């Protein structure tokens, strides 16, 4: 049986040594994952309430679709990331658990149901993401904008963060989202440039950097955010270079987390990073000038999103003196 990542060769790392990957059974075995990667089984009143709300309004969350390990903690803290534009993606990234295929027709009522859910859940910080919809002329940007505006009308005091696709670099699409005035604009770089052919074969590293730069150019007041995974075979100098690239393109908030292979059909994992290594990257990121760095084994884009935004705002105000 061949896997979808096996036809995606990448260049060797800068040190020239071939990358060795962990066998899937070792990753998932009883003694495979280190203790710091153990997450609680999702349960609790907050978790059940959010699940019922999402089901009742026919909404999707990336928490479920991408099999996020933090779903129990976040949902019990009344934090969820809404996934708009359906749950079928037009791309086939090597790390992602979201279904790939032909997407459904657009649901034009979805933005209003998301706003209704935000109101019912009493959220102070809503995160909106989506699958890629490359078949749409604007990549779904207009639906992002409609969702932001619907939340503003229903819950005026709620901060809105968007985690967008790259819209194939379409500046008009990026402007459509920024014109709706999100508080935070997030687009993930995901990995180091050398690994793009395997990890993000339909994306371009430079294009993602330009999306972030252009969003900040359009609205200097918006917080920009990006993140990447480690454990895919990158080396230290590539991690540091990627962090510098993001900072040089105006990114305010950085997230770094451990890649965890969703299934045997996804990209293999090279190694586990320790909590001490993540702490070192956080320190380095703050020294580079990021307003906030969330770096840890179980960190994902929206993990502690409200706290990230508040901390970054304080940092930006402090920098202005």
From Swiss-Prot:
The keyword Ligase does not apply. It catalyses: [[Fe-S] cluster scaffold protein carrying a second [4Fe-4S](2+) cluster] + N(6)-octanoyl-L-lysyl-[protein] + 2 oxidized [2Fe-2S]-[ferredoxin] + 2 S-adenosyl-L-methionine + 4 H(+) = [[Fe-S] cluster scaffold protein] + N(6)-[(R)-dihydrolipoyl]-L-lysyl-[protein] + 4 Fe(3+) + 2 hydrogen sulfide + 2 5'-deoxyadenosine + 2 L-methionine + 2 reduced [2Fe-2S]-[ferredoxin]. Binds 2 [4Fe-4S] clusters per subunit. One cluster is coordinated with 3 cysteines and an exchangeable S-adenosyl-L-methionine. Its EC number is 2.8.1.8. It is an enzyme of class 2 (transferase). One of its GO terms (cellular component) is cytoplasm. Pfam families: LIAS_N, Radical_SAM. PROSITE patterns: RADICAL_SAM (PS51918). [4Fe-4S] cluster 2 binds at residues 89, 93, 96. Residues 75-291 form the Radical SAM core domain. Gene3D superfamilies: Aldolase class I. Its cofactor is [4Fe-4S] cluster. Pathway: Protein modification; protein lipoylation via endogenous pathway; protein N(6)-(lipoyl)lysine from octanoyl-[acyl-carrier-protein]: step 2/2. Residues 304-314 have a biased composition (Basic and acidic residues). Belongs to the radical SAM superfamily. Lipoyl synthase family. This is Lipoyl synthase. It comes from Rubrobacter xylanophilus (strain DSM 9941 / JCM 11954 / NBRC 16129 / PRD-1). The lineage of its organism: Bacteria, Bacillati, Actinomycetota, Rubrobacteria, Rubrobacterales.
């Amino acid at each position: 049986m061949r896997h979808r990542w096996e036809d995606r060769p990448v260049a060797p790392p800068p040190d020239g040594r071939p990358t060795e990957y962990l066998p899937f059974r070792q990753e998932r075995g009883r003694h495979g994952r280190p203790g710091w990667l153990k997450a609680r089984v999702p349960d609790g009143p907050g978790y059940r309430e959010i699940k019922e709300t999402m089901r009742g309004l026919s909404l999707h969350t990336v928490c479920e679709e991408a099999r996020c390990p933090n779903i129990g903690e976040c949902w019990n803290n009344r934090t969820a990331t809404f996934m708009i534009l359906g749950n079928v993606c037009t791309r086939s990234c090597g790390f992602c658990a979201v279904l790939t295929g032909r997407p459904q027709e657009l649901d034009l009522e979805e933005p209003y149901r998301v706003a209704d859910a935000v109101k019912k859940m009493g959220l102070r910080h809503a995160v909106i993401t989506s699958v890629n919809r490359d078949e749409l002329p604007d990549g779904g940007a207009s639906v992002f904008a409609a969702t932001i505006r619907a939340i503003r009308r229903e819950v005026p005091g709620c901060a809105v963060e968007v985690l967008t696709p790259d819209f194939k670099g379409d500046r008009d699409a990026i402007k459509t989202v920024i014109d709706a005035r999100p508080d935070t604009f997030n687009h993930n770089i995901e990995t180091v440039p050398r690994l793009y052919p395997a990890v993000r074969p339909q994306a371009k590293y430079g294009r993602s950097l330009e999306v972030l730069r252009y969003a900040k150019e359009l609205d200097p007041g918006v917080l920009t955010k990006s993140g990447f995974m480690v454990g895919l075979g990158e080396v230290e100098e590539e991690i540091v270079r990627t962090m510098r690239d993001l900072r040089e393109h105006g990114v305010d908030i950085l997230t770094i987390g451990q890649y965890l292979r969703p299934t045997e059909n996804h990209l293999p994992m090279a190694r586990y990073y320790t909590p001490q290594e993540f702490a070192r990257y956080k320190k380095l990121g703050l020294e580079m000038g990021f307003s906030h760095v969330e770096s840890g084994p179980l960190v994902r884009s929206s993990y502690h999103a409200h706290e990230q935004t508040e901390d970054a705002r304080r940092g930006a105000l402090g920098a202005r003196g």
